[in-house]
A protein has these predicted regions:
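Sec-dependent signal peptide cleavage junction
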Residues: 38-53, 170, 177-198
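Extended hydrophobic-aromatic, low-complexity segments
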Residues: 30-33, 74, 82-87, 100, ...
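Conserved helix-turn-beta segment immediately C-terminal to the redox Cys motif
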Residues: 69-72, 86-109, 176-182
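Thiol/disulfide oxidoreductase modules built on the thioredoxin-like
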Residues: 127, 137-179
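Short active-site neighborhood of thiol/selenol oxidoreductases, capturing the structured segment around
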Residues: 34-91, 105
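Hydrophobic beta-strand positions
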Residues: 23-24, 76, 155
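N-terminal targeting signals for export/organelle localization
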Residues: 1-20, 26-47, 192-198
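Thiol-based oxidoreductase modules, predominantly thioredoxin-like and allied folds used
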Residues: 101-117, 126-138
């Protein structure tokens, strides 16, 4: 069991590239449900639906790797989670403040399949970031990202390197500020070394 757990968390270590995700957003969620994924009860049924709709699905995917931003907040959450109901609105406020001065995006992953409940929450709370879920179950997100409770928050850089993880959302501005200061110090040190070398 310990080795299994180590194999799961190894790709999630700070400094690692975040595992990619192939997700469906709210716009394409209805189309995927019409294909029958919302009523498929077994993995065999989902597999058959996947192969039946294989040509239509790839253009619908939103991938983590395709999101372009200097900083990317990756958050896994559930509408029914009491802690998420506190943290997600806080994250929205932080996101709106941060994006005024820094290139930051949020890739918000719903960990359950209740599309209508999720979509209603997004509309009601005006979550204007990237909202995705996995109705096709191709990502195995709970294992891939070691999700045993929600919300689970990661802060990634522009190369999708995990900079921080498992922090409360109110720590995100301080973390980004620290990374910005670190980057500035490295840039100044590099310029100083170039001048000395000349």
């Amino acid at each position: 069991k310990i080795i299994e757990k180590a194999d799961i968390v190894k790709p999630l270590l700070i400094g690692s590239v975040a595992p990619d995700l192939f997700m469906i957003d709210t716009i394409n969620g209805k189309a995927v449900n019409k294909m029958g994924f919302d009523t498929a009860k077994t993995s065999d049924a989902v597999t058959k639906l996947y192969y039946k709709n294989m040509d239509e699905l790839p253009p619908m995917y939103k991938t983590l790797s395709s999101v372009q931003a200097k900083y990317l907040v990756l958050v896994f959450w559930d509408v029914e989670c009491g802690h998420c109901q506190t943290e997600i609105p806080k994250l929205l406020e932080i996101y709106h403040d941060l994006r005024k001065t820094i290139d930051v995006k949020v890739f918000s992953v719903y960990t359950v399949d209740e599309f209508d409940k999720w979509r209603k929450y997004i509309i009601d709370k005006k979550l204007d970031w990237i909202n995705v879920y996995d109705p096709i179950h191709i990502n195995n997100i709970k294992t891939k990202y070691d999700i045993f409770s929600t919300p689970k928050v990661y802060l990634l850089d522009k190369n999708k390197i995990i900079k921080s993880k498992h922090m409360p959302v109110d720590k995100i501005p301080d973390l980004i500020k620290a990374y910005e200061e670190e980057e500035k110090a490295k840039r100044i040190a590099g310029e100083t070394q170039r001048k000395i070398a000349e």
